[in-house]
């Protein structure tokens, strides 16, 4: 008999049988070896065949293993094994059976039939396990479905639907699918398209995360519950698993063979199956090699003839990129657009999913948490879609509470650390013999006893609370299972089981759950098992860096005294500090316009008066770091062509992939202070970009992504009108000076730009009185640097006044002061430190002598 007439699976099994015989030192390959190999083969057909025929496979395996152990072992043959006469006879019988069935190739299931028609040890074992020729013959007919074995890969194509699809209706029956809330319009539209005579293939298109897959799951649940028109009743929804279809298809044509097997199986089902292809665009080009046909082209004939009932799902971008390019494939599908649900719909969806997440995380999700998840995610996460982002928020909040429940409470942890500390001290004191140590040891023992008693009481309480939570969880799991069983009983019409569950089991479990939950609420001291809006806000704050969590009293106090904090760094600019503080307070109190930035300001004034310093102080106040400020020097954007660097180069230009200078910074940190320094030096086209930011709080970058600026503070600084400020300082009050400066500003900037800014703030020139305070701030930084090297420095009042005089320049503001400190203090100090005149550890005093500042110890 020619071995190339065996199917590829049968050939592999024969090779495995040879390896088995070699490994066991048997001289011949017996039918037992081949049967063992066939039963252990991955993706083989013999094991499923025997199982479907009702044969006891476990017993058969055990008998074969024992028989193999009894076979004679021969050593020193040098790895030479031959097929036994019995195996050759059985294989010839297989050939005869294949010819009788008009098969071109011999498939592995015929081996079972041949063994039963033969006589031998294996025949007796099969019969003992319950196999007969008639039973196996019938099982083979059922499995083949009337097909002939016409090619070597025929066995791989068999049961293709079972191998390469997931039965969603079966999962719906078992209650494994999440409930689908709302989306009635989309499900109805999908059913409507499926009911058509031709082109009855809907494709669900929408943004990622809006619930396209959920709609198909909802359809499967409706079919199971019988809530569909007559034409769709008793149909099955199968989801095509593209991963397993492509995985392992090493040779050319293997993928097409598998897909053909799926399509053949579908055509045999005669319209009783709806095939769901998630990520439909993956079918276009899938399996396409040199001259090979891709999956999309193989689907076209089946779709056109109506043999294939298909539901696709893909995103808008991928539909445009892949499906629309292939007009022949596109016309065979009917589009069903899935829009993002509203916040109200999302709240309803979350309420429906609540029980599943409570069961998974073993927590209780409150209704305010659900409302907060929908509203906060809608407002603060702009680059993702509802309901996906809201579900993720609830999921992660539940996960964080579960983590806290599983770890030791903080109070217990603190006590444990204290006990360890006391025990260490006790061991040390035991070695001492003086009276003071003995007295301390007695006190220590008393404290240790008390702490250990406290610890054991707390631990008992913690364990009791955990046990109570576990009990509640078990009741919830039982209740969920009872509801699923009730649904299954309703479908099959088992009235006795339904009444037992509906009027007996479920009410009893609900009563137990209510009692356990009430008890839980009274007794819980150490553990938290409730997800509230606070946890949801904390998760969102961790994701985005935007502080949306409820303000603690300490933060409220901090916001109320914000001006004092900012004045510690910015001297003398009361109007500017007040304007910025009010904007931040409005935002944190939730009163600011949700569609605009927190605040947008134009700071005007001479150089060196604190415009940039105020931005740094604000960034430090909000984020505890100067680095949280996005600083863009607008003098870099003087040319027209450099404007595109802010939002990123357009498609086709170099640097398109890199994104924009401004947009990327804000996309990564949506909550930040943006400083546009020296804004009047920028090209006028820059202001066209800024109009969108200041008015709508959004900007579209070069790649078409919308960047959210609603949680940023936009500050622009400019020197416009600084000469007028210098000129009229002291002669005019603040409002008059602002009017004069605004005349200059309105000539330089367009009205629509000025109109969108929240406030234009004019900074005053600095007076002599201000410079002494600024000198103190600058010197504090110097003192810190010297402290690190072991020097303690103080300055006398005359020296401070001398510095103020030396650094005063009404034109240049506070910057000359920095130079004065460098020349008068830092330079002499550096020389004295290096020459060894100043000794670390001895205080240093800075004083004035002969018109110079000197350091004395």
From Swiss-Prot:
Q: Where is this region: Linker?
A: 341-545
Residues that coordinate or bind ATP 1:
206-213
Q: Where is this region: NBD2?
A: 555-765
Residues of the region (Repeat 2) are 83-146
Q: Which residues form a coiled coil?
A: 404-492
Keyword field: ATP-binding, Chaperone, Coiled coil, Cytoplasm, Nucleotide-binding, Repeat, Stress response
Biological process GO terms, please? Answer: cellular response to heat; protein refolding
C-terminal, as annotated region: 766-857
For binding ATP 2, which residues are annotated in this chain's numbering?
A: 605-612
Xref: InterPro entries: AAA+_ATPase, ATPase_AAA_core, Chaperonin_ClpB, Clp_ATPase_C, Clp_N_dom_sf, Clp_R_dom, ClpA/B, ClpA/B_CS1
Q: Does the keyword Chaperone apply?
A: yes
* Molecular function as annotated in GO: ATP binding; ATP hydrolysis activity
Entry's transmembrane regions: none
Q: Which residue intervals make up region (Repeat 1)?
A: 6-71
- Chain spans, region NBD1: 159-340
Please report which protein family the annotation says this sequence is part of: Belongs to the ClpA/ClpB family.
Described by its record, this protein's role is as follows:
Part of a stress-induced multi-chaperone system, it is involved in the recovery of the cell from heat-induced damage, in cooperation with DnaK, DnaJ and GrpE. Acts before DnaK, in the processing of protein aggregates. Protein binding stimulates the ATPase activity; ATP hydrolysis unfolds the denatured protein aggregates, which probably helps expose new hydrophobic binding sites on the surface of ClpB-bound aggregates, contributing to the solubilization and refolding of denatured protein aggregates by DnaK.
Per UniProt, subunit arrangement is: Homohexamer. The oligomerization is ATP-dependent.
Q: What's the protein here called?
A: Chaperone protein ClpB
Q: What is the lineage of its organism?
A: Bacteria, Pseudomonadati, Pseudomonadota, Gammaproteobacteria, Enterobacterales
